[in-house]
A protein has these predicted regions:
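Short coil/turn linking the two alpha-helices of tandem helical-hairpin repeats
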Residues: 139-141, 146, 184, 215-224, ...
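Short, surface-exposed recognition loops and adjoining beta-strand edges that mediate ligand/DNA contacts
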Residues: 57-66, 182-204, 218-299, 424-437
């Protein structure tokens, strides 16, 4: 793998702070590294590697937001204990490694000889998609973050505001949307048509834009930022979501039933028409390689983990009670109850607790373990991390339409998802709050599957009612000071010996008091 001099991106963030091991010996390395497309491919592949491995930067918020009744080790984290969150030591290192590589490509692609217009668009489009996705994720999890101009300027960077980070994401996502083809026409670094939806395309760029604009408007409302026109942002979200739903950005469609969805999610090699963007489970990287879907692995238990028995249900990292699922799906005809949960109509009681047994992901990967009675040990759920699928876009459009007062449009999108599940259309008995109904529909649709719930809670302003522990009692000053975001990683300010390497980056006020 090539090595580059990190021009101090001095975002200490990227050098010492982000611990980037990318130090070229001289400028000649830059010139030589991009002279042919084969060399350019190395950088594009590195961007994809970091894109596939950056989710650890957001893990604490994923766990805080999950719908769960019990956890094995994360009770204090989910209660919002500041010191526990700080000790979780989430670090945005890999996100900024990805950002650096994307900027590096944009800085140097002009040196690549013999590059066709299509190949130029592919490589530049991948870089812009990665930058858009990276800044989107940073704006959600950390709020304030560093926006780097390029990979060559020697200077220190301070934190930008959340809205500035969102706007940076939008700027790059728009460029990716304009440059990239639909997924079916996408040719990767090998020159072959893409076989996995892990690459930037017109469809997932549009989905990224729909999420960025929804987040922009929602954060303006949450933080009372009157300089941002929230409704204009919601209209843009609806615009890009509609492009995806209407087939303008690729041929995506809802699968027929929740059970069929589970079968497709459980097969990394399946062609899932609902899938828009995924992080691929690459088992070839080693015997200890696991799925990027942390959520699916947190809920993994018997019977998918065949080394366990029903009596081990109480030992799963995250657990749900049957009563919680009955409340979440009040309609007994909702097919998601029996598709997403194993033998849902049968009780699975352990030590007096009747558990719902996760079954959305149905296959596992095991390693040989001669010391185990079964001769094997559970390694991972066998699944790609399908980060966005079409149902997400329908419900995001419904949410933004409801905020804009388009009750008819929001209801239609909500009921499209309910219809697939065989559930009663909105408004069902007792339903009168459309916005809350859409939020709960997202819970029903994405339970056990992804990290969306924490951010759904924030977009809708439900942090006082849907989160526990310290969250309901947070003051306006706490929230303005960063309480709903992760603390800025210490590596952004100091080296491994504690020496300050970037005095422009300051910890958010809420977190500073606990350090």
């Amino acid at each position: 793998m090539k090595r580059y001099i990190l021009p101090a991106l001095a975002l200490s963030l990227l050098a010492s702070s982000c611990k980037l091991d990318l130090t070229p010996e001289n400028a000649i390395t830059y010139s030589n590294a991009f002279s042919t497309e084969a060399e350019l491919n190395t950088t594009t592949s590195t961007i994809h590697f970091y894109l596939d491995n950056c989710m650890d930067a957001f893990s604490p918020l994923t766990k805080i937001g999950l719908l769960a009744d019990e956890t094995q080790d994360d009770g204090q984290l989910r209660e919002g204990n500041p010191r526990t969150i700080i000790q979780a030591a989430a670090d945005w290192e890999y996100v900024y490694r990805m950002i650096f590589e994307a900027n590096l490509l944009l800085d140097n692609i002009g040196k690549t000889q013999g590059l066709s217009e299509d190949r130029y668009a592919y490589h530049v489009g991948q870089a812009h998609f990665a930058l858009g996705f990276g800044y989107f994720m940073l704006s959600r999890a950390y709020g304030q973050a560093v926006i780097t101009a390029n990979a060559k300027d020697l200077k220190l960077y301070g934190l930008s505001t959340q809205q500035q980070v969102i706007d940076a994401g939008i700027e790059h996502a728009l460029k990716a949307f304009e440059l990239l083809p639909t997924y079916d026409k996408l040719r990767t670094t090998s020159g072959n048509l893409a076989t996995y939806k892990q690459y930037g395309s017109k469809g997932n760029s549009a989905t990224l834009l729909a999420h960025l604009y929804a987040w922009k408007g929602s954060m303006a409302e949450l933080y009372g930022d009157t300089s941002v026109d929230a409704n204009a942002a919601y209209r843009k979200s609806v615009e890009y979501a509609s492009k995806v739903i209407n087939g303008e950005t690729g041929a995506y469609s809802l699968v027929s039933t929740p059970d069929q969805l589970c079968q497709l999610l459980s097969d990394p090699n399946a062609s899932n028409p609902e899938e828009i963007f995924s992080l691929v489970y690459d088992k070839s990287r080693g015997n200890e390689s696991t799925s990027k879907n942390e959520v699916a692995n947190l809920f993994a238990t018997w019977p998918v983990n065949s080394t366990l028995t029903q009596g081990d249900l109480a030992q799963a990292a995250f657990r749900l009670k049957k009563s919680t699922i009955e409340k979440l799906y009040p309609d007994a005809d909702d097919a998601r109850r029996t598709a997403f949960f194993y033998e849902f109509d049968t009780d699975h009681e352990v030590s007096g607790v009747n558990y719902a047994v996760p079954y959305k992901f149905r296959n596992a990967v095991f390693t040989v373990d001669q010391s185990a009675e079964s001769g094997k040990s559970f390694l991972s759920i066998n699944a790609n991390y399908v980060y966005w699928r079409l149902a997400d876009v329908y419900l995001l459009r419904a949410e933004c339409s409801a905020k804009l007062g388009d009750t008819s449009g929001a209801t239609s999108d909500l009921n499209r998802i309910r219809s697939r599940a065989g559930a009663t259309a909105y408004p069902a008995a007792g339903e009168s709050d459309l916005k809350k109904a859409i939020f709960h529909e997202r819970e029903r649709e994405f339970i056990l599957e992804n990290d969306s719930r924490y951010y759904d809670i924030l977009r809708n302003g439900y942090h006082r009612t849907e989160l526990t522990g310290k969250f309901p009692s947070l003051t306006a000053a706490d929230i303005a000071g960063g309480a709903l975001c992760l603390p800025i990683p210490s590596s952004a300010q100091r080296d491994k010996d504690g020496k300050v390497i970037n005095g422009l980056i300051l910890q958010r006020p809420y977190w500073f008091r606990y350090m």
